[in-house]
């Protein structure tokens, strides 16, 4: 059934979801590490990545650095003759698995709203990925998946919001 117009009640719920996800994005509560790690491992499994380690980063910059180091380590460990073909195959496989879920990660609130308020039904895999994105959003700041590892980022220690806009973020 196609929805042409939202009812006033459903329209009012948009602000509730926006506020909920803005609060999650600007939360300075410590990460719920067990919850985040469980969701991250499940996301990696969906992507076909066997997780050997979980790394916690203090800042997004540290997380990005860990992610780049994980990929650099893999490239360095491969012999030159094997590197190109294995790299292309691994990257294509990982990207194909993650592309759809990661591309829209900023839209978690939109898809959750549609699921909960508009009774949109997603296929089982998509619903599971959405649930896991929601778990990540509710439990830590960010997630990176690399070969053999997942990297999670702790939440900031300070988020300054002025007039509904984020103006300053600090990490320890």
Language-model segments: residues:
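Short, glycine-biased loop/turn motifs at secondary-structure junctions and
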Residues: 1-172
């Amino acid at each position: 059934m196609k929805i042409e117009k939202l009812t006033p009640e459903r329209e009012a719920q948009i602000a509730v979801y926006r506020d909920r996800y803005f609060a999650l994005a600007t939360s300075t509560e410590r990460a719920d590490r067990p919850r985040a790690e469980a969701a991250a491992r499940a996301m990696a499994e969906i992507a076909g990545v066997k997780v050997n380690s979980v790394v916690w980063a203090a800042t997004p910059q540290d997380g990005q650095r860990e992610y780049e180091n994980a990929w650099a380590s893999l490239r360095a460990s491969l012999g030159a003759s094997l590197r190109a073909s294995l790299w292309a195959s691994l990257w294509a496989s990982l990207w194909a698995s993650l592309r759809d879920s990661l591309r829209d990660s900023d839209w978690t609130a939109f898809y959750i709203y549609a699921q909960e308020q508009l009774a949109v039904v997603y296929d089982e895999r998509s619903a599971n990925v959405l649930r896991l994105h929601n778990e990540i959003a509710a439990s830590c700041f960010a997630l990176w998946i690399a070969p053999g590892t997942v990297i999670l980022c702790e939440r900031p220690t300070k988020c300054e919001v002025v007039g509904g806009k984020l103006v300053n973020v600090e990490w320890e």
